[in-house]
């Protein structure tokens, strides 16, 4: 742990680690840009997509349509709570090319969660060490993304990602 107390040296290594991890995650992000909606994506976002086509980015109408979708699926299907609302606001509302943002929509909250968890553990062990938490979070994120059994459903398909990954975060 002495290494992490030397702030200048640990900042340099943290910068290198972040750059290395970003380079390792870059192929997964590039693949994510080619993701397209499928299956349940169309049903959950039908009402909000209709609003987006008719009115553009009209936030009050989009939120109202997302709320109506949530109420509909809650009453008629499986009792979705928050995920029905989030699924109705998926990135592909304004066109399929925006659906590729799903990867980032999942990975950013996941990284924030892992950073928070690592920060709690590191501060409990040694409150003076501040730069170890982001390093651990990057390592855990890399392991999480690379070790996922089915990345197509967990990172690139909004329905699978929101219902399972986002709540982990």
Language-model region placement:
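Membrane-embedded alpha-helical segments of multi-pass membrane proteins
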Residues: 101-113, 161-169
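Short hydrophobic/aromatic helix or loop-helix immediately within or flanking a transmembrane segment
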Residues: 69-104
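Hydrophobic core of alpha-helical transmembrane segments in multi-pass integral membrane proteins
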Residues: 21-29, 111, 115, 136-146
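Start-transfer (signal-anchor) and selected internal transmembrane alpha helices
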Residues: 1-27
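Membrane-interface micro-motifs in multi-pass membrane enzymes
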Residues: 132-133, 140-169
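Extracytoplasmic catalytic/substrate-binding loops of multi-pass membrane glycan-assembly enzymes
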Residues: 31-53, 58-63, 74-86
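Membrane-interfacial loop-to-transmembrane alpha-helix junctions, especially the N-terminal start
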Residues: 13-17, 74, 127-138
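Transmembrane-helix motifs of polytopic, lipid-linked glycan transferases
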Residues: 105-128
